Amino acid sequence: MAVSHRLLRPATTTIKNTFSSLFIRSLSSSSSGSSLDPKIDLEEAAAQLGKSSSTSTSPYKGRNFHWVFLGCPGVGKGTYASRLSSLLGVPHIATGDLVREELSSSGLLSSQLKELVNHGKLVPDEFIISLLSKRLQAGKDKGESGYILDGFPRTVTQAEILEGVTNIDLVINLKLREEALLAKCLGRRICSECGGNYNVACIDIKGDDDTPRMYMPPLLPPPNCESKLISRADDTEEVVKERLRIYNKMTQPVEEFYKKRGKLLEFELPGGIPESWARLLRALHLEDDKQSAIA
């Protein structure tokens, strides 16, 4: 892995400067001859971009949300971030998806990343930052404004970089009992043909005096996908437990980072999607006229 470290570990100052430059450009106006002073409120810059280019029909259009989802692997960040993305009319940017896209490519770096991921290791900061910068630039080119980040930041270094170049409005930290979390991760399945995500685990945890019963029904595929389901290579009990251990060790400081800034919302998932989605909307003071249909 010596080659990997040389490829992926430039100086921290260089990382911050490079990402700051790319991030600022990704949110800045593309008007001819204009430039963005880093001291300017980037939300205002994003709002100016959104005025001329956003095509969202969301009732929340124009508010340019800058939100982050935290939570252990498998907790459901993608599920709820995606729903909020549709509701609020802003893109859902999942760094896990960006990594998987890179893993599907060929080359030395891809093979080294596969080794890290398959052993439950977290991808180094600078690689995630590079992928995210490119995604934000692509979004800027398409006229996107606002975003919901899923899977970033995972370290205080990443959080500091992000804080230095944009104003995150809210950080939603999803929580789930470890017993349920492990079962969810081991039950994840993907359709090898359409790419749909499903979960075959039926979670039913008895309650006691301190905790209520938790029931999470399986998210089963349609009949045409049943025979095409596959598991992720890294969804084994050993790898999942190691991934959770590393995550908890590395992200506790991130939670404290945002808690001190008054931006952290702790949200304990009470059960399956219908119950959890309704409660999350109430916690965020949002309304979804279609929630009964999509839950």
Curated annotation (Swiss-Prot):
Gene Ontology cellular-component annotations: chloroplast
The UniProt record lists the keyword Transferase: yes
Keyword Plastid included in the entry's annotation: yes
Top EC class, one word: transferase
Residues annotated for ATP binding in this entry: 74-79, 188, 271
Binding site for AMP: 95, 100, 121-123, 151-154, 158, 243
Subcellular location: Plastid, Chloroplast
Chief location category: plastid
Region annotated NMP, chain positions: 94-123
Residue numbers spanned by region LID: 187-235
Reactions performed catalytically: AMP + ATP = 2 ADP
Coiled-coil residues: none
Keyword entries, A-Z: ATP-binding, Chloroplast, Kinase, Nucleotide-binding, Plastid, Transferase, Transit peptide
Molecular-function GO terms, alphabetical: adenylate kinase activity; ATP binding
Subunit structure: Monomer.
PANTHER family listed in its UniProt record: NUCLEOTIDE KINASE (PTHR23359)
Similarity comment: family membership: Belongs to the adenylate kinase family.
Function recorded in the entry: Catalyzes the reversible transfer of the terminal phosphate group between ATP and AMP. Plays an important role in cellular energy homeostasis and in adenine nucleotide metabolism.
Protein name: Probable adenylate kinase 6, chloroplastic
Organism encoding this protein: Arabidopsis thaliana (Mouse-ear cress)
